[in-house]
Amino acid sequence: MSWGRKLGKLVQGGEIIGLVGELGSGKTAFVRGFAEGIGVGKEAWVRSPTFTLINEYSGRMPVFHIDLYRVAKPEEQAGLNLREYLYGDGVSLVEWFEYLPAEEVDEYLEISLTHLGGAKRELKFVALGERYEMLLRKLRLEVE
């Protein structure tokens, strides 16, 4: 959660953050930390949108928590109007990011989470695009 919290403090709006990892790898926990960092109040119960597909939270900017687990195929995603969320003023965090068709996003920050046992997780960050490379550099400075 601490990495998510730190990242939530750094975003400016309009970011797309893809979360990749098996069930139980910590994707939703990462979003909880992110929500705290961006100023979503503790009264907002951040939970997986597996069944609602999209949860929206209010912080210093809107946070769109999207879960594509149950809508893995592009034709199943068609009615979600994902582009409105992905390219709006808020920040979109997309669980099961690998299910988003590649043509939907040009630049993004992808975070792969791996459960190592117990409470340990490994996070790998990949920035695609200058904006996200800069964001990742800022995040590194926060944790050093």
Indicate residue ranges for each PLM-predicted region.
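Conserved lysine of the Walker
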Residues: K27
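Phosphate-binding P-loop
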Residues: G8-G14
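Short phosphate-coordinating micro-motif centered on Lys-Gly-acidic
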Residues: E75, L80-E144
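Short beta-strand-centered segment that lines the nucleotide-binding/catalytic pocket of NTP-utilizing
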Residues: V40-E56
